[in-house]
Amino acid sequence: MITKKDKPLNIYCPLVSIIIPVYNGANYMREAIDSALAQTYENIEIVVVNDGSKDNGETENVALSYGDKIRYFHKENGGCGSALNYGIKNMKGEYFSWLSHDDIYYPNKIEHQVNILNKLDNKDTIIYGGYELIDEKGSSLRYIKPDSVLPINKLNISLLPLLRGLIHGCSLLIPAKYFHEIGIFNEALPTTQDYDLWFKILRVAPIHFDESILIKSRFHSEQGSKKISNHNEECNVLWSSFLHELTEEEMIKMEDSPYLFLTRTATFLSNNTPYKKACDLANTMAKQVLHDTKVSVIIPVYNRINWAIEAIESVLIQTHKNFEILIIDDGSTDDISELTSICKKDKRIRYFHKKNEGPAAARNLGIKNAIGKYIAFLDSDDLFYKDKIEIQLKFMEENNFIFSHTSYQKINEKGKYIESVHSGFFSGNVFPQIIQTCPIAMPTVMGTLTLFQENLFPENIRSGEDCCLWISIASKNSIGGIDKELSKVRISGGTNTFMDPNKYSVGLINITSYVLNDPYLSKFSPFTINLLLAAVTQLRLLENKDYKKSNISFFNNNYVIQKIQTYCFVTKILILLTITSIRQEGIRATISRIQRWLRKHI
């Protein structure tokens, strides 16, 4: 027990005022007052405010029976808020602790909370916790534990526990300074005056959750809110005002994004309250947040203008209308007049021209000029489904992902269906497995602008540069996957990795080199072994007689074709040599050997 006499010089021992408002409460108030008097912390005062009780003096007689053990005040009836305000105006303490006349404090309620304050640097912190629910006779019903609903870190975000119904007013220990700075209870609100004031105070005050149960809250039929007919309407108005007053920054602090805050608030209101109007408002505001979210679509273009126009058109018909298109012309040599004409006609399209440096540099230029909250990538020969952005945006906002991808469909040069690729299953914490298997296709990707501003594409790599970036991002973040086809990837000759074993092999080798040269990623170098083996295996495709008949520009020289056929037999033993090299000389030496072989022979 801490007493004023025993107070050590280095122990914070402030005067705490316990305010007990009461109206016709003779049936329960003695238990409440006794629990206040039984506090193990002695530096307290007990202020009882009789709010004009009309019970033939029964309430007053109970209060007067305590003599000078309490400070007793009588006033005209004005409601609970007015009684609390009267107590606040007459309290002498540095801290306020509310005790309803029908509730009970555990003996250590005040001492325990003051002990917490002693451990905190900021003595202006509000302390709160859970409570025990009891019935009319005082029998325990259950324990209400906020930490079973939200993690501790969330419970210490000032407004969030209030807006999830987790704060009981009698569990609070509040510095009196906030009544002077923020104000007192709104007496015009018969049943919501507490939440109204807590909302105002908690917008500026820090809070600290403590898991100890320190109060007993009585549930009975005579409680004021149950007897006031317009209670639900008053609550609807109050909650609606909360939603309108909260800033974007406050919503982000509570739930990481305005959309998440609004949808989770709507869910809370729907599941736990009858406040339908406030719930509908939260849902409406959430939809508006999505509508107002701009997505930047980056399309690098190098020749093949007709396909680029098709790609642009697939964006223009999106069901989500708030987007911009950044066309990055990577030094095209074809006639681009039709493309530039389309760009000039739509203010949502911005055109950039640069010298040819490869798709990585083109995408990076787009990232540096994007203004959307999210970025989506679309290669100029690929297509979006019309609801691609809408579905992916909602998925990311709902699940708080900063990076996501989807399943997709392969099409041929004429746009005809080839097959579906269900890559969207690849999600969650996929690192380091993503090093050896990365199924993420470029036009399926969407991420936050901030993410890509901090993680640009490696411009020194022209094949496999996308996978290198996905690996880097996955090493630090969870990946969101949607197993729904939302993009079409065109499979064509010449420039497409799917059709070019050599390009695919070089891409795998580039990825391996990227991993090995990164200080962090290189710790997971064993995962690159399969990449090397896959690269060598792909070279076997060069033995295919039909391959030399393809229109792939790399092989349009007969001399090169003859060189390939001459050295193709090497691939039959190259896998075994690679395995031996890895075992004896390591991955770095092996990758260098393969790169030299490719440069020399292919």
Curated annotation (Swiss-Prot):
InterPro entries: Glyco_trans_2-like, Nucleotide-diphossugar_trans. Its EC number is 2.4.-.-. GO terms for molecular function: hexosyltransferase activity. One of its GO terms (biological process) is biosynthetic process. It is an enzyme of class 2 (transferase). SUPFAM superfamilies: Nucleotide-diphospho-sugar transferases (SSF53448). Belongs to the glycosyltransferase 2 family. This is Uncharacterized glycosyltransferase RF_0543. It comes from Rickettsia felis (strain ATCC VR-1525 / URRWXCal2).
